[in-house]
Amino acid sequence: MHVFYTPDIAQTLELPEEEAGHCLRVLRLGVGEEIMLTDGKGCFYRAVISAATQKRCVVKVVEKTEQEPFWKGHLHLALAPTKNMDRMEWLAEKATEIGFDELTFLNCRFSERKVIKTERVEKIVVSAVKQSLKARKPVVNEMTDFRRFMEREFTGQKFIAHCYEVEKPLLRDVLRKDEDAVVLIGPEGDFSPEEVALAAEKGFQAVSLGKSRLRTETAALVAVHLMNLTHAE
């Protein structure tokens, strides 16, 4: 069954314009056909198309199902984006398929990219939510300066994965199940010493992702996978 993202389905029984176009013009579905909706907030809706025009698709909800969370705690990934945006789009897709709650792009001292089109990333995340049959959509935040991000209050565990030669435990060994967790991943040139010091001052624990040398997007995906595996029900 085809899945469509309808964040406001509780207020209006109509697909968003872009989803309606995909449903009616691309997939050529019509009145009377059954579809599945997700609001991205934890619920699936089995629905039937009740009216359709060139740009509008009205539905009748037949059944609402709340999807139990696959993990407990809030899983937050914050990273400095790579210069090649394709790699960040790949990460957004794969991390969503695995499962996490929030994505923040960081503007660090050695960042290769200072601007992110979050609308594009948002579309990729929505597509991955539908493809992987998840009822919850990760939040995608606008790019934030590293120092400003450090001013935020975080509950639970806080980690920074950097490459400086200091003693660091493996992330997998210090993650605690059911607790909120935020992991910071730096740019290809790593975090600056000042950023590492500031993070430590704010209570972020330095961790290792293993012995391999990883690209930014690979390190980020490893972090998401470890958080998900630790917190999964």
Which residues are covered by each model-predicted region?
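N-terminal positively charged helical leader segments and presequences
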Residues: 1-66, 119
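A generic structural signal for short beta-strands and their flanking turns/coil linkers
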Residues: 11, 31-33, 43-45, 55-57, ...
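Generic structural signal for residues in well-ordered beta-strands
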Residues: 59, 137-141, 206
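Short, ordered loop/turn segments at secondary-structure junctions
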Residues: 64, 108-111, 211-212
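RNA substrate-binding interface of SAM-dependent RNA methyltransferases
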Residues: 68-160
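Active-site/ligand-binding-proximal alpha/beta "capping" segment
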Residues: 159-197, 204-211
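Structured adenosyl-cofactor binding patch, chiefly the S-adenosyl-L-methionine
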Residues: 193-233
